[in-house]
Regions:
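An N-terminal assembly and electron-transfer interface module characteristic of large anaerobic redox
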Residues: 1-199
Length: 199
């Protein structure tokens, strides 16, 4: 299945419904939150295996929530995002400092352990902390790039407006997670796409 904004491929028999879109967006944000929390905490856990155990506990709850066929409660989604971050933030951690290593590259290779030879596990076994950008950040980059295309490469002003609306939507969707990350002891909040774009 290919989902893209420019209609490169059609998917006969596959229909995007409002419910499916909502479930997919919530799953996306839960995945980003899990990745950000787990990779930050696991290298410093005082009790070996505690970060993975907490991840498994919350993963089951998230699957039960997102796996529901109905339209989901946005209030419950927001509450779950905040509670996941709080639980990871309160996991006992050591005070040691480890080198932080960024994992970047093509989307599939970056996010699928089997495609990157389990690079995060390797980095952690070698005494490092892996840092993987959120998948939402990639989507925001794609949307923000439309500004450049409209300003310099002949893309339409309408496409620019639509993509800027999408940016505001994604930022709204992860607002609760960002606010909770900002209040935490161990995490950094997600950046707004406009900030790295200025660099």
């Amino acid at each position: 299945i290919s989902i893209n904004m420019v209609g490169l491929e059609k998917n006969p028999g596959f229909k995007l419904t409002p419910s499916l879109i909502q479930h997919g967006l919530y799953a996306l944000e839960f995945g980003d939150t899990f990745m950000r929390c787990l990779y930050r905490v696991r290298p410093y856990e005082k009790v070996p295996g505690s970060a993975n155990a907490l991840h498994e506990k919350w993963k089951k709850r998230v699957i039960d929530f997102v796996g529901n066929t109905k339209i989901l409660s946005h209030r419950k989604y927001r509450k779950m995002c905040r509670q996941i971050i709080r639980d990871f933030d309160n996991l006992p951690m050591t005070d040691e400092k480890k080198p932080r290593v960024g994992v970047v590259g093509e989307i599939l290779v970056k996010f699928l352990p089997a495609a990157n030879n389990y690079i995060v596990d390797l980095l952690e076994s070698e005494g490092a902390e892996a840092v993987v950008p959120d998948l939402t950040d990639f989507l925001l980059y794609c949307c923000y790039n439309q500004n450049f295309k409209a300003d310099y490469l002949g893309a339409t002003a309408k496409s620019k407006r639509i993509n800027n609306m999408l940016i505001r939507f994604f930022e709204w969707l992860r607002k609760d997670a960002r606010d909770e990350l900002a209040k935490s002891k161990h995490f950094e909040p997600t950046a707004y796409i406009q900030d790295p774009a200025k660099i």
